[in-house]
């Protein structure tokens, strides 16, 4: 399995390259505008980027999905509630994408945005349960999502609470969380940590906004 986190220090954002070198396919989650790093990584790993996944429509930066799709011919996937104007494949909660031995499962986590989706990662070589979840803007290291970018702030806050407690915190305590933003990003609060990853168990115990 290929798993790489690509960080963007200027905006405090993170994107991900995921794939299976045995079958030569990969996907990029939440690509930044400058796409050369993904193309270089894919060439080095010997994989073709065939899929682009968006956790949600981003308010803090411009996505590189259009450029990356044009350069690779990859399909852009986003939750149906996003209703973007660009060409895309719309999915619902529970949708899965197979990349050889790797499965990416959509976990609809509305709140920050109505279409917001986390992606659970399953590697059949490691087991049947997710070993990690890409939480996007729903759960950060030491913080949680902002509700003020939702259609309605109060409904957004309720949605975030439900998504955290009914979709994410029910995962195994050992499940790794890899967020869409790191410390310093405007999408989080003062509690957001500079660490690039955490676990469900650690956040459940130490994240003050989950207590």
Go through each PLM region and give its residues.
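Hydrophobic, small-residue-rich alpha-helical packing segments that form membrane-like cores
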Residues: 2, 25, 65, 69-70, ...
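Generic structural signal for helix capping and beta-alpha/helix-loop junctions
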Residues: 59, 85-86, 187
